Amino acid sequence: MTNLSGKKSLNTVTLVFKLPYYTQWGQSLLIAGSEPALGSWNVKQGLSLSPVHQGNELIWSGRVSVATGFTCQYNYYVVDDNKNVLRSESGEKRKLVLPEGVQDGDVVEIRDWWQDASEALFLRSAFKNVIFNGSENAKRELKTTSLNKSLEPEDIVVQFIVSCPRLGAGSTVVVTGSNPQLGRWQTQDGLKLNYVGDSIWKANCLLRKSEFPIKYKYCKISEAGVSSLEFGPNREADVDLSSPKPSRYVLLSDGALRESPWRGAGVAVPIFSIRSNEDLGVGEFLDLKLLVDWAVNSGFHLVQLLPINDTSVHGMWWDSYPYSSLSVFALHPLYLRVQALSDAIPGDIKDEISQAKKQLDKKDVDYEASLASKLSIARKIFKLEKDKVLNSSSFKQFLSENEEWLKPYAAFCFLRDFFETSDHSQWGRFSQFSKEKLDKLVSEGTLHHDVICFHYYIQYHLYMQLSEAAAYARKKKVILKGDLPIGVDRNSVDTWVYPTLFRMNTATGAPPDYFDKNGQNWGFPTYNWEEMSKDNYGWWRARLTQMAKYFTAYRIDHILGFFRIWELPDHAATGLVGKFRPSIALSQEELLSEGLWDFDRMSRPYILQETLEEKFGSFWTVIAANFLNEYKKQHYEFKEDCNTEKKIIAKLKNSSEKSLWLEKEDSIRRGLFDLLQNIVLIRDPEDSTKFYPRFNQEDTSSFNDLDEHSKNILRRLYYDYYFARQENLWRQNALKTLPVLLNSSDMLACGEDLGLIPACVHPVMQELGLIGLRIQRMPSEPNLEFGIPSQYSYMTVCAPSCHDCSTLRAWWEEDGGRRSRFYQTVIGSDDEPPSRCTPEVANFIVKQHFDAPSMWAIFPLQDLLALKDKYTTRPAKEETINDPTNPKHYWRFRLHVTLDSLLDDKDIQATIKELVTSSGRSFPGKVDGAEESGEKLAKVQLNGKP
């Protein structure tokens, strides 16, 4: 036994750590902790554990000598032979406090269980501070656990430790078991545990050596005295009495009290889509209070939103796209309620607000008009109240706490308006950001200081209004779930202030998938992860910290981007000809060894005269004359001024020959893009000896005109690149970045994992406790047309649709053949399906999702309104929020009913709540979420004397 405590003390105790854990070959376990005895959090200096087989378990154990007053934090780690971390525990750091009475020479045995990510979920703020309302636990009297009795030689002190976050007000936890001290399985006589904080309950029990082994279980007892025994087999504890010096104290750190899986439900709607009696043509933060009330009445524990950050890049309706952030910290002025800016709004401004309400009360959102109206009114109120607000203590505190992002944001907005562009490369000497320039721009002595302060003022009120709505939701036990976009606009505050964090010569997108057969190009620059890692991803940590001010859960948009991103050159307009970053490319040497040598033939557009004739008919000569050069007989290449997608778009738009193709511009552009994309390999622009297989290469004539030997090699290399060789690289990449996000806040994290999913994604998400997404029409199983909700895994969110696809009603109407197949295979009827999605059909599909095993069932509000004929009068296509195939889609969908009127409709709220309750999902007002089934099981097991 080694003394690693780093302390000189005559009074020492021996700690024996034990943990059951099955490892793979080459793996081992160690402990790292806060004290020198455990490496001071340096894993390589931690306490190594040794494995021993005991029955069906592999027990890892280790000993260390420490001082009698020793306390520490610690965690277990799976490491390789070089002590590199392969896996670490989830949740809070473990805390070790030795029991009172431990004396010099005692042996204290600590028996732990590996902390899985799924267990740690219920310690996240969504559960701890909202659903299970941590304030109830905070109100509990914290008690110490002591015996007040001197020990005899045959005595062993057992400390029971269990986590129980799912506990109603007034409830307690007991341990019941096989011996008298534990009540002989009578829960009312069990050993009561003391609450010690952070959802942890403890109690000491004095047992004689002869009483081992013991069997026991934990049990919740409600304020009314109703017992709910934990699920699963009996827990067991024994001591090794054959040891020369057996353990005097045994700490049974048993993890979480075992309960039936908690399941909840929620509603999803963009803020801009909300309609209320108070809004100015678009939903507002304060409307969330109405939405929360409706959610509670309908049995929902969660409200999910789209991104809410400022997107004011172009100064027009293009900015309606909520995923293209001007700032990842600033809130969007569109969601401001101007009526709440002051308690003393003059009559003329009130009249202007009333007039604006009438003018903006349209079927869809008028993005430009609503934003302009709000900013105009806000400026007038600002002029009247700026001194009062800017000198208030709450504003000064807001500015002080947020100045790191707020001042650059305000300066950016001023410069954007001054130069009439958000492209900061056109701002002259202000193109390059510096702290000195910023300080001058926002200093009080400038002529434009009021403009700077106006942006502060707007952000302050947005913060106050969203904070009010968030506090209201927490009070009502409703989670607000935000959305973390994968990218930022290339003309944004963030790329101006932190240019080295972004690869500005690239664009982010997605390869062809369900959403778009041509792939997607979102235009965001990709991230420079290597640079971001230098400060442990500080920019990301700041983003999550800011989000956590309002939200207790969030959706990670395109979580695949944290494994690998689909990177496109900045001259691309579509998303087809990209490559994954990071990825292991096909090297020139590798291709040569396979017998592939004509790299130019495979990596440049393959354009033959016969292809031109086939694609453009008799018009091919005009196309060739304007866009192509014939470099050898009947073989063509693009001219320099149109050899990229963006150049083609510009030439079609500006050419003097435009009259020749005006009516055919779209088809000509598509045809030229097809020619440009007619390649087999993509040459790396940064290393000409590296290549990447073009996605769907077999769809090209470039591939089809190759010899069979080359085709077979390319097929094999294609599969290897996309589905094999990258898996470990992508796993390691995700394990570098995602844990930083998850540990930056205590929000509950969900990942949007739709599209082309590498095999490594779901295991990593499971390991990290990330909740996935399942959309019925987009099954992750390759051989299914429709997902089967009853077979979804627990760690998922299930939904019949989402904002990136048509609603349930529209989907039903789109394709008659698909509708018939769904009606037959899913609903189970051979009858002719109705041509429209009736409330009965909607009810069946919605109920499928409520009944699913998924932790969350979250429904777009449009799909819930389909449950009642009254709300299905609007054409279904008009309810679609986004069309991913259109990069310039106008995000303007607005509900055709107000939240006020929905709150008055008791019938639909009752219909939805009945679906929630009958599915066994938790709802606001229901305690614990699983009492009934727990009580039934408890009665069965107690009567059977487990």
UniProtKB/Swiss-Prot annotation:
It is found in: Cytoplasm, Cytosol. Residues 7-115, 150-264 form the CBM20 domain. This is 4-alpha-glucanotransferase DPE2. Pfam families: CBM_20, Glyco_hydro_77. Its EC number is 2.4.1.25. Residues 919-946 are annotated as: Disordered. Its main location: cytoplasm. GO terms for cellular component: cytosol. It is an enzyme of class 2 (transferase). The gene is DPE2. It comes from the Eukaryota. Belongs to the disproportionating enzyme family. Coiled coil: none annotated. It comes from Oryza sativa subsp. japonica. One of its GO terms (molecular function) is 4-alpha-glucanotransferase activity. One of its GO terms (biological process) is carbohydrate metabolic process. InterPro entries: Carb-bd-like_fold (IPR013784), CBM20 (IPR002044), CBM20_DPE2_1 (IPR034840), CBM20_DPE2_2 (IPR034841), Glyco_hydro_77 (IPR003385), Glycoside_hydrolase_SF (IPR017853), Ig-like_fold (IPR013783). It catalyses: Transfers a segment of a (1->4)-alpha-D-glucan to a new position in an acceptor, which may be glucose or a (1->4)-alpha-D-glucan. Keywords: Carbohydrate metabolism, Cytoplasm, Glycosyltransferase, Repeat, Transferase.
